[in-house]
Amino acid sequence: IHIGGAYGDKKATLERWIDNYYKLDSNTQMRLTVENDDKENMYSVKELYKGISEQCGVPIVFDYYHHKFCTGGLSERDALNLAIKTWPKGITPCCHYSESRRKEHLDESIKAQAHSDLIESTICRYGHELDVVVEAKHKELAVLNYKY
């Protein structure tokens, strides 16, 4: 889940989110994850860690591409490590990977956050075992064409 809107007060928004989280049944709570946002004024991995994971233990799905837009002052490696820290022992952390459609098509009119058709770069896992969800317009074809 993307926390999304800050509504002018990130702290209060996170508190409301946590209040609502505790209204969910335990089966739903066990399956819930949060993901870092792709806009600078939204939620970084660091903000999710302090505002959600430390409070109620919800794991963070690290999105590599979103991190480029909303770093929270952390390097990619540090943000990934912080997200991994939120996952329960024995569960492989999940992350999302996508690339820029704007760069792929050399077209500045394309929205900066738009996903590319295929994946061209090597996904840097920094030595971690991860379940990587590829987010690309060509779906399975992007996975089949990926060179690692």
Listing of model-derived features with the role each one plays in the protein:
Residues Y7, Y21-Y22, Y43, Y49, ...:
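Sequence-level detector for tyrosine residue identity
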Residues L32, D63, V132:
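Conserved, mostly hydrophobic/aromatic
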Residues V58, F69-Y148:
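Histidine-acidic metal/acid-base catalytic patches
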Residues I3-Y7, N36-E40, Y64-K68, E99-R101, ...:
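Active-site-proximal loop/turn and secondary-structure-junction residues that shape catalytic pockets
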Residues I1-P59:
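Active-site acidic/histidine proton-transfer and metal-coordination neighborhood
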